[in-house]
Amino acid sequence: MLTNFETNKVFIAKGLSFVPYSSTAYSLVTSLYNRNVAWSELPYSESPFHIWARDYMPVQVNKDKFVRFNYNPDYLRNYPEYKPYTSMMLSYLGVKVINSDLVVDGGNIISCGDKVIMTDKIFLEIVALGI
């Protein structure tokens, strides 16, 4: 799995441009620009409920390979209208993924070279779904 420094591009949710996140978005974009890091706004991410793109977007495992985990967090199970339009985003971007049935928020994964650190929330999610 690639570390954050090895990924191709940073995508930022459009919802970050709205108050109360706008100053954070400005600081982030300025920092990326100053470091010559390629970035773009993520299509279909205007909702303030879709700002955590790292949670629902695929994980990049090598230059051309992405794994999409099942984004079905416990805190959104009763609010399907808050789930992001990930399939539409990926289609628009032309990203092909390997789908996984594992229920994992991408934000709960940290890549450390050839190792991955994950939170134990994956076990709670599996039990909650009866898997």
List PLM regions with ranges.
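The feature marks the mature, well-folded catalytic cores of soluble enzymes
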Residues: 1-131
